[in-house]
């Protein structure tokens, strides 16, 4: 048995009245917990919020062998999902999923578009609101979403 070896599962805090999409992470948590328990690991589950001190404290107290990162957003904002990996990286804790840098770059639409353009990947023309007066691509009729 490996019960002295802790695995930590982190996920975003979910309201019990949330949408099926939001609640799905709890199904994932149970599946991972069951698999790890079956293999003899001690498992701790931590809902992560914007109080990242709590995550840091749990990491320091439990010293997990590995963290299963199931965080999909923080405080309902996908753009913040790079924060838990950044904490894990700072404490040199191995974890599943992408690191903070790729998550930061890919969850910001404008940052991702700029990176694709710099790499020579064609993207549709775009502009930000402050540049609209200096931009010639906005002439014509559009459907905005």
Description of each model-found segment:
Residues 2-12, 18, 30, 60, ...:
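Active-site nucleotide/adenylate-binding loops and adjacent lid/helix of ATP-dependent enzymes
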Residues 15-19, 63-107, 122-125:
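A short, GP-enriched loop/loop-strand-helix hinge that lies immediately N-terminal to
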Residues 21-37:
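Short catalytic helix/loop segments, enriched in acidic residues and glycine
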Residues 36-44:
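A generic structural motif
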Residues 39, 91, 119:
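Conserved dinucleotide-binding and phosphotransfer motif residues
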Residues 44-47, 96, 127:
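General small-molecule cofactor/ligand-binding pocket signal
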Residues 44-63, 78:
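Glycine-rich, highly charged phosphate/nucleotide-binding loops
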């Amino acid at each position: 048995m490996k019960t002295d070896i802790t695995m930590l599962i982190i996920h975003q805090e979910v309201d019990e009245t949330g949408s099926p999409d939001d609640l799905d992470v709890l199904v994932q948590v149970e599946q991972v917990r069951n698999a790890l328990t079956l293999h003899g690991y001690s498992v701790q589950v931590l809902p992560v919020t914007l109080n990242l001190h709590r995550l840091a404290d749990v990491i320091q107290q439990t010293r997990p062998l590995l963290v299963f990162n199931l965080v999909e957003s923080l405080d309902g904002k996908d753009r913040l999902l790079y924060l838990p990996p950044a904490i894990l990286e700072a404490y040199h804790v191995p974890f599943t999923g992408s690191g903070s840098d790729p998550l930061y770059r890919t969850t910001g639409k404008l940052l991702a578009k700029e990176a694709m353009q710099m790499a020579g990947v064609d993207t549709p023309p775009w502009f930000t609101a402050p540049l609209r007066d200096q931009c010639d691509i906005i002439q014509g009729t559009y459907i905005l979403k």
